[in-house]
Amino acid sequence: MVKFLDLHAQYISIKNEIDFEIQSVISKSSFIGGQYVKDFEKSFANYQQANYCVGVGNGTDALEIAIEALDLPNKSEIIVPANSFISSAEAVARCGHKIVFCDINQDDYTINIEDLKSRITPETSAIVAVHLYGHPCDIDSLIIIAKKYNLKIIEDCAQSHGAKYKGQKVGAIGDIGCFSFYPGKNLGAYGDGGAILTNNKELSIKCRMIANHGRIEKYNHKFEGRNSRLDSIQAAILSVKLKKLDIWTDNRILAANTYIDELKNMTGIKVPKKNDSVKHVYHLFVIQHPERDKLKEYLRLKKIETGIHYPIALPKLQAFNYINGNYDEFIACKIDKDLLSLPIGGHISANDARLVAELIRSY
């Protein structure tokens, strides 16, 4: 069997370090905040080439806190790509703003710049730049647009830990960056966790206050906030994993390149393309196939686990039925029925990728 995700195998490979750190946290009985969280925040900020990091409860909270901290005009429009996990759009609505969907590029699945331009109105205040599947957006173009229209750039980095755009790691290229440490991520906790990155000190302070009940100091609160804190056990686990991330990423890239070499000339299959200016970290390796569901079942019978990310484009979700707009012609809304995620991760070798590709060719 080739597993889609194998967190147990990953744990076994770092068991001694993980167990030691968890026991250390328990022994010291400092579970919320404290040195473990501070150490991880510093290490992760340095790793991502950012000045400030605020650990939070999860990736969705990171997005909501970031949007709130930016103090955008009330009920303003925020542009979100039509292919992503629901959090990218959900956070916008939960913060009282209006979701405006834009289309994606078919080759790399990131924001389509020309369609984005057509969605901007006087009510637009920000762009959620989703570095989907681990491939950074065209950030240079987004920055030009943001400056022209006075927009904020919120980087959704939930799937792009360590990804680079023109040599710079994502997360602090825009105004603010949001990360998820959901267990299945490239850098995953053993539970929920998230982080916010920025180079703006005042913005980082505000995010930290929002995440901790608007607190100035203990029992002194400047405004209403929320409870969204990265706990010490998760921070300790993430600190161990962060040291391994580059090795795991190299393994993902090797598997992805193997898939591409083996499948790129196959009729009916579309493999993802990578912009030369980016480092793609391949959180997911997503192909397009006109008989996706049949191929998925065929691979299941051959003991190959696969996934679908995502089976329904965001504008087509029942949750967003209230949003007006003609999205039928969106690439995102046409290809969602074709998307298939192949196994990738630290547990997938080049030989595993060749085996999967061989079975796909024999379909």
Where are these regions (language model features)?
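N-terminal "arm"/small-domain region of PLP-dependent enzymes with the aminotransferase-like
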Residues: 1-30, 35, 343
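Conserved coil-to-alpha-helix start sites within the AMP-binding
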Residues: 84-89
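PLP-dependent aminotransferase class I/II
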Residues: 8, 20, 37-43, 47-53, ...
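Phosphate-binding glycine-rich loop
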Residues: 29-77, 91-95, 101-103, 168
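Short beta-strand->loop structural element characteristic of the AMP-binding/adenylate-forming
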Residues: 98-108, 307
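Helix C-cap/helix->beta junction micro-motif
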Residues: 95, 148-149, 302
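Active-site phosphate-binding strand-loop segment of PLP-dependent enzymes
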Residues: 107-189, 195-197, 202, 341
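Hydrophobic "anchor" residues on beta-strands that sit immediately upstream
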Residues: 2, 77, 151-152
